[in-house]
A protein has these predicted regions:
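Glycine-rich phosphate/diphosphate-binding loop of Rossmann-like nucleotide-binding domains
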Residues: 40-55, 135-253, 263-273
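Helix-enriched interaction subdomains in cytosolic or periplasmic regions
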Residues: 1-11, 104-108
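Short, well-structured alpha-helical segments in soluble
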Residues: 77-89
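Short beta-strand elements in bilobed, periplasmic/extracellular small-molecule ligand-binding domains
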Residues: 35, 57-72, 185-187
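Short glycine-rich anion-binding loops that position phosphate/pyrophosphate groups of nucleotides
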Residues: 96-103, 211-213, 237-240, 288-289
Length: 326
């Protein structure tokens, strides 16, 4: 039986339509949420990511600013820029694109961002808000995973949920979100024992470990006795360039193998592609979780604008123009 495909692109379009309505309603009150992105250096992947985020802002009607400090920037210089953005009433969200150059203390820079403008949801204050189940800004990828589950009618309360990965960016916040939704949550990592058996008990599996095809198809709970198979959320986006590895992972997908031969690479998730024949529902790679990350960044920017104004935290006063804006 082929799994039901959990299409992240479709859900992105639904949420974008909802956000456009929210943004239009805010505009009637003279409010236009805005996102400031900070990109250091010439990393092609980072440039592409930021370009996509700015394009999403333009599509939705959000204000956006791109700040491009030079590669040789210091930690202190970055902290001054963040302080300027924290004080700017027009800026509702601040995005620091990672990685930063080696000479910059990324932890200090990220933690200098006002929690009220931390639209990535990485600040310790926002993590604490999530732990205590209070309104705040949640890390974008886990928030997107929850939207996929909820909008596809996946039952969360009482479900056995397994999260593979314990990173601060995905694994830990994902586990907390599932816990707050009344799932019974198990978090696994590199030291976990009997991993296949743990995964086989999962009604919901979230894989976020960064290893192509690590979760085997026969680890996934199949449909049985009228109950659906596991819902699988595959966060991994791994570029496979080795022909033998591609052949092993894509042996049952001749069209994808043909594309690999033409391009020299293929994107594969953390779950073996053959799981499409075992799982009850499955996010594709690409086209599953990926589109949701930028979507939730946009959602967080709108949410930050509303939360800050409701709390009277519209800013600390207008500052001098932020550095390197363009």
């Amino acid at each position: 039986m082929t799994a039901r495909i959990l299409d992240g692109t479709k859900i992105r379009d639904e949420i974008f339509a909802e956000l456009k309505e929210e943004i239009a309603a805010l505009a009637e009150w003279g409010l236009r949420p805005g996102l400031a992105a900070v990109l250091v250096g010439e990393n092609p992947a980072s440039q592409l990511y930021v370009k996509s985020k700015i394009a999403a802002c333009e599509q939705l009607g959000l204000a956006s600013w791109l700040h491009t400090p030079p590669t040789g920037v210091t930690t202190e210089w970055m902290l001054e820029l963040v302080d300027d953005l924290n004080r700017d009433d027009n800026v509702d969200g601040i995005l620091i694109q990672l990685p930063l150059p080696a000479q910059v203390d990324a932890k200090r820079v990220l933690e200098a961002v006002s929690p009220a403008k931390d639209v990535d949801g990485f600040h310790p204050v926002n993590m604490g808000m999530l732990v205590s189940n209070r309104p705040g800004l949640v890390a974008c990828t886990p928030a997107g995973c929850m939207e996929i589950l909820r909008r596809n009618g996946i039952a969360l309360a009482g479900a056995n949920a397994v999260v593979l990965g314990r990173s601060d960016i995905v694994g830990k916040p994902m586990a907390l979100l599932l816990l707050h939704a009344n799932a019974t949550v198990t978090v696994c990592h590199s030291k976990s024992r009997d991993l296949p058996e743990i995964v086989r008990r999962a009604d919901i599996l979230v894989a976020a470990i960064g290893r192509a095809g690590f979760v085997q198809a026969d680890w996934i709970k199949p449909a049985a006795a009228g109950k659906p198979g596991a819902a699988v959320i595959d966060v991994g986006t791994n570029k496979v360039t080795d022909a033998s590895e591609a052949g092993r992972l894509l042996a049952n997908f001749p069209a994808r193998l043909e594309r690999f031969a033409a391009k020299g690479n293929a994107l594969v998730g953390d779950v073996h592609p053959d799981a499409v024949n075992t799982a009850g529902a499955l996010t594709p790679v690409p086209g599953g979780v990926g589109p949701m990350t930028i979507t939730m960044l946009m959602s967080n920017t709108v949410k930050a604008a509303k939360l800050r104004r409701a709390a009277g935290l519209s800013g600390e006063g207008r500052s001098k123009p932020a550095r390197t804006a363009r």
